[in-house]
């Protein structure tokens, strides 16, 4: 047994309702309306689940819900999620800065990768989820002297970095690294 065992997993659901005796729903043309309602219901559950992953589960009063002494505060706030400071008091790299050199961004990516692999013993292949600002900056050419690959291409060559993907829940200099290998 580990001290971090257990996570509260709420059930996410949504629904839609049609009056089954309504004659319109006894015709084939009603299938499109029912399919649209089902799609809307599924999208609602997906939005709630993504919010739960990033921001945790709160009760109606806005407090984190607790069950059997367990709670989930989301990737941003939970104590069981490793947080690495990218600011001046940490790794000191701003992946969104257009003035940062490609070499500095690559060095910052190596430091971040090593923090996860060496310090936290995370040896699975990493998938990096980054903000839109970071993804835009990583699409710059690595060298201005000749148009070779992008900064993202260079980071993807690093051992252990399998993919870099954009996530709309992230903003600014936020990165979520998930071992998916």
Residue ranges and their predicted role:
Residues 13-107:
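Alpha-helical scaffold segments that mediate packing/assembly in large oligomeric complexes
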Residues 45, 49, 109-119, 155, ...:
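Hydrophobic, Leu/Ile/Phe/Ala-enriched alpha-helical segments that form helix-helix packing faces
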Residues 56-59, 66, 100-141:
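Structured, hydrophobic secondary-structure cores that serve as assembly/anchoring elements
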Residues 19-21, 130-134, 179:
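Helix N-cap / beta->alpha transition motif
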Residues 37-40, 108-115, 151:
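Short, hydrophobic/aromatic alpha-helical segments in well-folded domains
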Residues 1-14:
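Assembly/oligomerization interface modules of large self-assembling protein complexes
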Residues 87, 136-181:
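Sequence/fold signature of self-assembling virion shell proteins
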Residues 49, 53, 117, 121-124, ...:
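Residue-level signal for secondary-structure boundary elements
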């Amino acid at each position: 047994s580990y001290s971090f065992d257990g996570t509260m997993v709420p059930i996410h659901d949504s629904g839609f309702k049609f009056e089954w005796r309504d004659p319109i729903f006894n015709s084939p043309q009603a299938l499109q309306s029912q399919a649209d309602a089902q799609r809307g219901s599924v999208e609602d559950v997906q939005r709630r689940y993504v919010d739960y992953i990033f921001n945790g589960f709160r009760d109606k009063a806005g407090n984190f819900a607790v069950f059997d002494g367990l709670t989930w505060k989301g990737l941003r706030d939970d104590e069981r999620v490793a947080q690495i400071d990218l600011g001046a008091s940490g790794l000191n790299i701003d992946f969104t800065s257009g003035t940062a050199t490609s070499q500095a961004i690559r060095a910052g990516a190596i430091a971040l990768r090593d923090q996860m692999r060496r310090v936290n013993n995370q040896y699975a292949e990493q998938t990096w989820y980054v903000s839109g600002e970071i993804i835009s900056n990583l699409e710059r050419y690595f060298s201005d002297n000749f148009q070779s690959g992008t900064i993202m291409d260079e980071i993807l060559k690093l051992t252990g970095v399998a993919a870099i993907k954009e996530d709309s829940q992230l903003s600014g200099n936020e990165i979520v690294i998930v071992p998916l290998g």
